[in-house]
């Protein structure tokens, strides 16, 4: 993998990266988040505003952890649709669904976050976990989320955040470079995870994400820093 690919990967190369890391994806997510990602994902589901019986869309669903959190809330009368561009991660999600959550109505689709295969005004809520940073066009991804939501409904988008505090920012950079990447080396995935810091450097700040959301048609948008500012959740209402 070239240095240029690490700093500005194409969507095809990002898809290939996730295909390669799929077998270790859950373990590395737990390590990346200090074991807290399940809590943050539950917070995102709560901020999405869904309730029992609702239809929830989880975009960039990966191995399904955020979708499963949503399925527990919407229950057997509702439905969760998980969409991702990586077939390998979707297979893991489907396997977990079958073994642990078979009683909950869920559907897994391979698709593009920039061209969602759904009708306008179809969902009661939407979530996205650690996906917005990896799409090729953030405003277009937000446009599609706004389109498929019913009027008055919300999307909650969890991702890394660039801390305003210099100490937290330095810790985040040190942790990625000196803990996460060396751990990934154990699975021979050093280059795959080395793209994390460049992707974070390119990722819009919370206020910029809010601006994008409002520009594409959301009526309201707020960005909440969490985990000492190391993570953030963008909540936008149609």
Curated annotation (Swiss-Prot):
One of its GO terms (biological process) is phylloquinone biosynthetic process. This is 2-phytyl-1,4-naphtoquinone methyltransferase. It catalyses: demethylphylloquinol + S-adenosyl-L-methionine = phylloquinol + S-adenosyl-L-homocysteine + H(+). The keyword Transferase applies. HAMAP family: MenG_phylloquinone_subfam, MenG_UbiE_methyltr. Coiled coil: none annotated. One of its GO terms (molecular function) is 2-phytyl-1,4-naphthoquinone methyltransferase activity. Disulfide bonds: none annotated. It comes from Synechocystis sp. (strain ATCC 27184 / PCC 6803 / Kazusa). The lineage of its organism: Bacteria, Bacillati, Cyanobacteriota, Cyanophyceae, Synechococcales. Pathway: Cofactor biosynthesis; phylloquinone biosynthesis. The keyword Nucleus does not apply. Gene3D superfamilies: Vaccinia Virus protein VP39 (3.40.50.150). Methyltransferase required for the conversion of 2-phytyl-1,4-beta-naphthoquinol to phylloquinol. SUPFAM superfamilies: S-adenosyl-L-methionine-dependent methyltransferases. Keywords: Methyltransferase, S-adenosyl-L-methionine, Transferase.
């Amino acid at each position: 993998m070239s240095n240029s690919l690490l700093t500005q990967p194409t969507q095809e190369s990002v898809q290939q990266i996730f295909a390669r890391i799929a077998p270790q994806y859950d373990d590395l997510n737990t390590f990346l988040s200090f074991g807290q990602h399940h809590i943050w994902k539950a917070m995102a589901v709560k901020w999405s505003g869904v309730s029992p019986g609702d239809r929830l869309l989880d975009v960039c669903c990966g191995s399904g952890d955020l979708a499963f959190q949503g399925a527990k809330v919407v229950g057997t009368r509702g439905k969760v649709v998980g969409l991702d561009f990586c077939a390998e991660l979707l297979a893991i999600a489907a396997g977990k669904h079958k073994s642990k959550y078979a009683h909950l109505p869920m559907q897994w689709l391979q698709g593009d976050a920039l061209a969602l295969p759904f009708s306008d005004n179809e969902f009661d809520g939407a979530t996205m976990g650690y996906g917005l940073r990896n799409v090729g066009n953030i405003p277009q991804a937000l446009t599609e989320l706004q389109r498929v939501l019913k009027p008055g409904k919300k999307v909650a988008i969890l991702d890394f955040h660039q801390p305003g505090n210099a100490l937290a920012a330095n810790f985040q950079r040190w942790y990625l470079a000196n803990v996460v990447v060396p751990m990934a080396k154990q699975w021979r995935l050093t280059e795959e995870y080395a793209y994390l810091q460049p992707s974070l450097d390119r990722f819009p700040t919370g206020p910029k994400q809010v601006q994008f959301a409002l520009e594409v048609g959301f009526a309201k948008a707020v960005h909440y820093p969490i985990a000492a500012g190391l993570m953030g959740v963008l909540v936008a209402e149609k």
